[in-house]
């Protein structure tokens, strides 16, 4: 068995990994969870728009990154639950993405998105990657 396989076999399966995130303007922290690649793919697929080029007769799919980020935040946020109908009704909206837009200021959304990206392993900084590549 190679070293990577040994390492993987020794690791515990991480389930329900969560982290608390302090968001300015809210007295209590938000709780976000990690998602799986399968969940992420499913969310990404719902955010794709397929276009057909008549000249080349080719189909291409483009992902709406803003919609993907909103849906990823909604899926990963345990508390508050953006899918809660009562909370949506209080803000006068329908849907988790609409609630996020109504409830959070742009800076608050970015802070929450960064926490979601970090817990899901998207935290690699380009400067860090560049430094690693140089060495």
Model-identified regions with their sequence ranges:
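Short, surface-exposed, charged amphipathic helix/loop patches that serve as local interaction elements
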Residues: 26-135
